A protein has these predicted regions:
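Short amphipathic alpha-helical segments
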Residues: 9-10, 46, 101-104
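Active-site histidine-anchored catalytic micro-motif
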Residues: 1-34, 131-132, 145
């Protein structure tokens, strides 16, 4: 949901709100592509604009508008995949999903991606010949009264692990 491109958050240089800012400072990171962004500051938007294409954002509202205008998710996935290098690290922030799938995440935002929509994108990435070299899942917060967020998170991890193995030709 968030760009996470803040230089610091509440006095912390290394926080959930600054992780992509810190990743952008690593010279070996060729490109950062964010999908489903729907909450970001003017400073973060300026940072994306000033990155000369090194940081690209596929905002949720733009994805939705393209869909409403008749463009398929498959076509949009092709655009997203084209923006990536051959080796891809997937950082899956659970709040990219529709909040009904992760209601206990720290800062839910209306809108978001469907679970299968995310994995259709990752499968398109693999079909293009790109390789997943690693992944993480962040900002999963289990509820006090139910395990819904945990179940969604575990299923995401399971799919990510299997798809990474497929991308590395260790599974079919």
């Amino acid at each position: 949901a968030h760009a996470d491109l803040r230089q610091a958050y509440e006095g912390f240089d290394y926080s959930h709100a600054s992780i992509m800012y810190n990743a952008s400072k690593i010279k070996e990171v060729e490109r950062i592509a964010m999908v489903g962004i729907r909450d970001y500051s003017e400073q973060e938007a300026n940072r994306i604009a000033a990155s000369n294409g090194r940081i690209v954002a596929f905002a949720d509202r733009v994805i939705k508008r393209r869909s409403y205008a008749g463009e398929s998710w498959k076509q949009m996935c092709e655009d997203i995949v084209k923006s990536l290098s051959g080796n891809v690290y997937v950082s899956f922030d659970i709040d990219a999903l529709d909040p009904s799938l992760c209601p206990h995440t720290g800062t839910p935002v209306p809108g978001g991606l469907a679970f299968e929509q995310v994995f259709f994108l990752i499968e398109a990435l693999i079909s293009s010949g790109k390789k997943i070299i690693g992944f993480d899942l962040c900002e999963v917060a289990p509820g006090v009264k139910d395990d819904w967020d945990s179940i969604v998170g575990v299923r995401a991890l399971y799919r990510l692990a299997n798809l990474m193995a497929v991308s590395q030709k260790k599974l079919k």
